[in-house]
Amino acid sequence: MSWAWPVPGVIVTLHLVALALYGLATALTLAPFVGFRPAPRALTIAIPCAGAAVHVVAVSQLTLVGLGPALSMLALCLVLLQLASERLVRGSAVSFFAAPLATGLVGLAILSGLAPGAETVGARNTWFVLHVALSALGLALMALAFIAAALYLLQFRELKARRFGQIFQLFPPLERLDQLNRVALVAGFPALTLGVLLALGYGAQFSGGLHVAKAQIVWGIFTWVVLGWAVWVRVVRHWAGRRAALASIAGFGAVLLVYVALKLTQPGAERFL
């Protein structure tokens, strides 16, 4: 008699544990804004670190094909970037948006289904795994740039109105948020570019590999163009501050809207698009 637990069950359980830890981290992050005392910084870092460790184990068991696995990988990249960025801004303000977003992505991944689908030929190929990982990293960095921009505008509004409440006290200075936005964009563009190039190379090298829908190609190219434009206005045109923040938010919003529009034309939880 075998006592081995089916792999799909293990994957879902690990994601549920990560979801619980991310949810707890979200509650601790939002607590000061609803009147509770801020949690110790060591705790606000340890809990998402534990969630990320469990999440890494879960993702390592996945076949990276379909909507659920893609959302899971994106959530993991976002949490890891959240933890890394807290050192740059010297505070936990990034988790104000990143923690709820990562929690929601993991929840959606579980609801969408994490079991391997029928289209798994070549899914463990190194080219394909790198394509998914780098593409998810590029999107997560774009989301991080959006988060930094949103935090910048919130802090800017508080300063302009001369309100020195919780937002002013808990959010980093504007200069650090602007720097985080720039770093995220500049790092995200090459990551996404490599992800797109690996997808093209994979398709050319392995003609019998995974099917790529036209919607995926359209959205991938559109996202790459938008991210490239955001980097161009920051690096070449030297946009900064409020104008750069608005550009990042507009770009991220456009990418989301196009994704939703394409997804509605081709519904189905078994594929990313």
Spans of model-derived segments:
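Membrane-interface helix-loop-helix junctions at boundaries between adjacent transmembrane segments
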Residues: 62-138
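Juxtamembrane boundary at the C-terminal end of a transmembrane helix
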Residues: 257-273
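Hydrophobic transmembrane alpha-helical segments in integral membrane proteins
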Residues: 1-25, 138-142
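Interfacial loop-to-transmembrane junctions
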Residues: 232-254
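Juxtamembrane inter-helical linkers in multi-pass membrane proteins
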Residues: 160-175
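Short alpha-helical packing/oligomerization segments
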Residues: 201-227
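Central hydrophobic cores of alpha-helical transmembrane segments in multi-pass inner-membrane proteins
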Residues: 19-31, 49-58, 73-85, 225-229
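Alpha-helical transmembrane segments
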Residues: 18, 130-150
